[in-house]
Structure formats: C-alpha cells, structure tokens
C-alpha cells in the first residue's frame, strides 16, 4: 500500500467525462485502477470483457430484471415517513425501502448480477467476503438458486456480532470460513477472499460486495445497483412530479450510496450526502470515517482514501456497524468528494443507535445499524427546535434516505450496547 497526494483543479462535473464512468483504465480521476498481482490480471480482464459483452446483451438484461422483479421483489417502495417528518418539523422524509428486498438489504442486487455473470462465464464456484453478513446471505441465496458452490469469508469478530446471518448462510448451503487474522473484521475477510481467488482463479468467481476493489468491480457493482436510483427517479416523478432535494445514504465501501446517487449525478440541484461511521468520535482513533479522516493510498487493488498511519500502514477501523467497519472506500466516492459533487459527513455509534430506536418507534421500521447512520444525520439536516446549521434544509424540501437494510441482524448488538450503558429497550 502506498500513499500519495494530488492537486485537483476545481471543475463542474461533466457527465460525458469518461473518468466518471470510469475511464478505460478503470480510473475515476486519479482514483481506482488495478493494483493486483500478475496472476489476477488475466482474470480481471476476462471479467471486464464478459461484463461489457453481457451488459449489452438484451437477453442478459432481461433475465437480470425479471429476477429482480420475481425473485428479489423489486421495485422497492418509496415510503413517506410521516411521523418522522412530523418529529423533525420537516423536511419531507422518504425512505427507499431496500430493506424489503429478498434477504433484507440492497446487497442482493449486486449478488444476483454477478452470479448471473459468473454462470455466463462458466464459473461453478463462487466466493465472497462479508462484514455485516448481508452480502454473504445474498450471495449464498443466489448460489442456492443456481446450484453453485459457495464459500463466504467473514471476520471472526463479525461472526460473533452477526451470528444470525452466519446461520442463514449455512442454512442456504454456503461454507462460512472465519478469518482470525488482523482485526478479524471485513478488511481481513476481503484479503482472505482475494488469496482464495488467486489460487483458484480458473474455476472461481469472486463476488465483491461493494464498489471497491480493482477495476472492473467498482463499475460493475455500481451498474447492478443502479436500479435503486432509477426506481427512485421514477417514483419521485409519480409522487410529486419532480426531483428530490437531497439523497442521503450510509457509506462503508459505498455500494448502496452509489446505487442511489449515480442516477442523479447529472442533476446538480440534487444534493448527494454520504454518511460514514464516526464510531466513538472523530477525535479518537476508533472510527471508520475514511473520507473525513483518511489519506490517499492503495488497498485491495484500487487507489482511494484510506485510514492509514504516517508510515502508510492501514489503520484499524471501528464502528458498531459491521457493514461500515472498513478502512477504505470505493474510488468513485473519493472522486465525487474531490470534485465537490457529493458531501460526506460522519455520525457516532451513539447517534446511530438513537436513530435506530427513533425510526423503530415512530414508523414501525427497524433499520440496520448501517442505515441508522444515514438516519442519524437527519438531526443535522432538519430545522428541529429552531436549530439551523449552515447545511440545514427547509421544511418543504424532500429528502430520500436509502433504507439499505433491516435491523434484525443487529438487535443483539444494540441490546448489548444499551445494557452496557444502563439502558434497555
């Protein structure tokens, strides 16, 4: 891993700029690229060529969208959160209900797309990494649907935090391999999955679960999640005949956020806001706020912002949310930050838990802890109690929050967290 600094010239985002898409080398400005061992270069080239070919194939697209409808249950609703809106006194808050997808999160969009691609490529063995377990469950689910061998790598600490999802993966026929090295979390699971892929590249497809990793993964994962934003645009037109004012999503690696944002990048009047995990606070080393506190370097095959020390070594990330507990971020998020098209802030563990409790009690929806980070930022955006920070928005503006997953998997974590602080549900 290396670190570097770059000089950026201010510019307006050009939707025709090939760097945005990304460019042929897989770069978003200086970010992205392909920093991998020579043994993986041919596999990545094969994957890129297969994706470009099949994504243009009407039969592939039709099969993908039919399965999104009939197997995943799309489109997911755009729900007006009336009581949450009343609580904050405005803005008008809508939830994009990815938690209602089959398996309970946005992750299945990408898992389905990649496994379909792997089948077309003749791969019969699928591997994946997972943090919160939702990507692992989604991948295991799709592998069961297509009768493929499935191996999931998961940090041992995350297996403890997300035991229900470990059970689901095994029930679906996947082999779950615990990773004891390093911090025993998502970063280490991803590293182990890459090692497996290097060894078994001829027979195996690696389903990366976020918009990180070497090219073409950031591009293809975004493509499979684009359905989130495409549906949102249509639903906004149907509900009020216009665009949302703000899109709000949590950011770990950043796939759910880009799935929502990408459709609206060319609409400058729509604010794009990503929320990272501040953990125990940005003033402490225990956070996962890569875009807020990181520096540029290379991790897991791509250049992006990373949490790293002065020697360029990757630092340990912390979040109560296993899905945000990652010291890197997708390279396109780094690019959107640098050109000023998207804003990135962070909320703490405490704030996320309070947001989870609030939505549960006001709307009858238990969100994932990942989603709760985005929901927590509504307190800053909303003019509640006369507080109007500089980036607050008006009471008639419309905010769409990506409800990226449901919170069943997090109940034990939240209950333990509250108990340690002398509280209960």
UniProtKB/Swiss-Prot annotation:
Under Gene Ontology molecular function, one entry of this record is: tryptophan synthase activity
Pathway(s) this gene product operates in, as recorded in its UniProt entry = Amino-acid biosynthesis; L-tryptophan biosynthesis; L-tryptophan from chorismate: step 5/5
> So what EC number does this one have?
4.2.1.20
Q: Which residues carry this modification: N6-(pyridoxal phosphate)lysine?
A: 107
Cofactor(s) in the UniProt record: pyridoxal 5'-phosphate
Q: What organism does the record attribute this protein to?
A: Synechococcus sp. (strain JA-2-3B'a(2-13))
Q: A Pfam family matched by this chain, by name?
A: PALP
Would the keyword rRNA-binding turn up in this protein's UniProt record? no
Q: What is this protein called?
A: Tryptophan synthase beta chain
User: Per its database record, what is this protein's job?
Assistant: The beta subunit is responsible for the synthesis of L-tryptophan from indole and L-serine.
> What NCBIfam families does the record tag this protein with?
trpB
Q: Which CDD domains match?
A: Trp-synth_B
Q: Look up the record and report any one GO term of the cellular component aspect.
A: cytoplasm
**Domain of life, per lineage:** Bacteria
What SUPFAM superfamilies does the record tag this protein with?
Tryptophan synthase beta subunit-like PLP-dependent enzymes
**Catalysed reaction per UniProt?**
(1S,2R)-1-C-(indol-3-yl)glycerol 3-phosphate + L-serine = D-glyceraldehyde 3-phosphate + L-tryptophan + H2O
What is the annotated quaternary arrangement, including any partners?
Tetramer of two alpha and two beta chains.
